[in-house]
Amino acid sequence: MGLDWPQAWLLGLPIAVVYGSLALFTSILHNVFLLYYVDTFVSVYKINKVSFWVGETVFLLWNSFNDPLFGWLSDRQLLSSQPRSGAGLSSRDVVLTRVRALGWHGPLLALSFLAFWVPWAPAGLQFLLCLCLYDGFLTLVDLHHHALLADLALSSHDRTHLNFYCSLFSAAGSLSVFASYAFWNKEDFSSFRAFCVVLAAGSGLGFLGTTQLLKRQIEATRRDRGCPGLDLDGGVCEEEPPVGGEEAGNITLGQYLRQLARHQNFLWFVGMDLVQVFHCHFNSNFFPLFLEHLLSDHISLSTGSFLLGISYVAPHLNNLYFLPLCRRWGVYAVVRGLFLLKLSLSLLMLLAGPDHPGLLCFFIASNRVFTEGTCKLLTLVVTDLVDEDLVLNHRKQAASALLFGMVALVTKPGQTFAPLLGTWLLCFYTGHDLFQQSPMTPVGSVRPWPELPAPAPAPAQAPTLRQGCFYLLVFVPITCALLQLFTWSQFTLHGRRLRTVKAQRQNLAQIHTLNIKMV
């Protein structure tokens, strides 16, 4: 009995499109979470300062260690398979395992997202538990989704093709930020709560449907062609020998860490990426503050809200342009160019000063857009590091999720250090403590101050605060760009070296990567 036409049409979608659509269901939740979770607990649930910082400190630790923990639990059998009855894991088995994991963890992510918007415990306890639950499921989803990027394709061209669809669907998901403005109301929270229920339901059902579709496509490909996946150039592949066997030995976590410590490109990359993660979250945390203190006299509230919203969508759209450049010039050259652009724009803004509203508006928006866009390109670099790790250590299978987790272990602290260092620098330079000063009319919703405002600062302090915000705005990207240009210059996995690694991985893996059905 034949399939009805909608089902047949869905099964006929390219795997690259189905894979990319998974980013939509994460994006519609995560952008709303980033924009409103602090304001919800500070302004609606009235969390106190001590509980806020305790929650953020525990979150820092959990956020750093859950990536390598989940990566190790997911991929340790790929480092040294312990086969049962002589059977191990093929490439197809690894991909199907990751798809099934996304089918479970995606809906759980949606449920943990809902837990933020209904008060069900004391504010401090709920803040801590919600952050840890949400970040745990987000980590599981991100690890398996990113690992599939390395497992589904080998060539840089095909990985940028996959990333293209991720950026496209992430941009669509970012539109939830614009929709949220129609429902956000601190005094009457019920409409925003209902909006979040709709988002969570759509995300959870989307994960269930898309992972089932991806699973059926992979299984149908094997039945139809007698191979574990589609070959990128349309050829037919053979089922590769399973992972495991008499030559596979047990690799402990300590041995794996020693292998990473000898992986020079990995070390230089995580040093650069730590700065990048810090800068991305610094921009997210202080974007509303910069709009408020540098531009509030020159732009309307609606213009500020529009700039805030567009800054979530534009990085994904920007990548639709940069990814073709990556296919032509390579990711290394494009990322280096973005670092140089960041440095040049920051120096230009420093020379121009804070009294040019149009230039300030462009710089604040472009700084966030280009920085976020660079973060999304770096996923492609990690997939190349996965290849190099496999070649250097002669693995049977690429431990993709584990390597993504180890990258996050080193770089994610930048996510928490960004607001801590930013508020400290502002307080050190201007004497303005965000936890003690009265908030002005908000342009956005990211507000890490408590519910009890102190008296407004004297008018004489205002110019100092404005000057402090301006110097923070320009000197942070200048410092980040200089550090990144140095570390990136030491990174050698590009050009001839990258081509050699790709060729060696093909030989080691007997070209057993799954194919993507191209558009």
Curated annotation (Swiss-Prot):
CDD domains documented for this protein: MFS_MFSD13A (cd17481)
Spans within the Cytoplasmic topological domain: 44-55, 119-126, 180-191, 293-305, 351-358, 430-468
Record's keyword terms, sorted: Cell membrane, Glycoprotein, Membrane, Transmembrane, Transmembrane helix
UniProt topology in membrane: Multi-pass membrane protein
Entry's transmembrane regions: 12-43, 56-74, 101-118, 127-151, 156-179, 192-223, 265-292, 306-325, 331-350, 359-393, 403-429, 469-487
SUPFAM superfamilies xrefs: MFS general substrate transporter (SSF103473)
Major subcellular site: membrane
Record-linked Pfam families: MFS_2
Membrane topology, Extracellular segments: 1-11, 75-100, 152-155, 224-264, 326-330, 394-402, 488-519
Signal peptide region: none
Residues bearing glycans: 250
Cell compartment(s), UniProt: Cell membrane
GO terms under cellular component: plasma membrane
Keyword hit for Metal-binding: no
Protein name per its UniProtKB record: Transmembrane protein 180
Lineage per the UniProt record: Eukaryota, Metazoa, Chordata, Craniata, Vertebrata
Gene: Mfsd13a
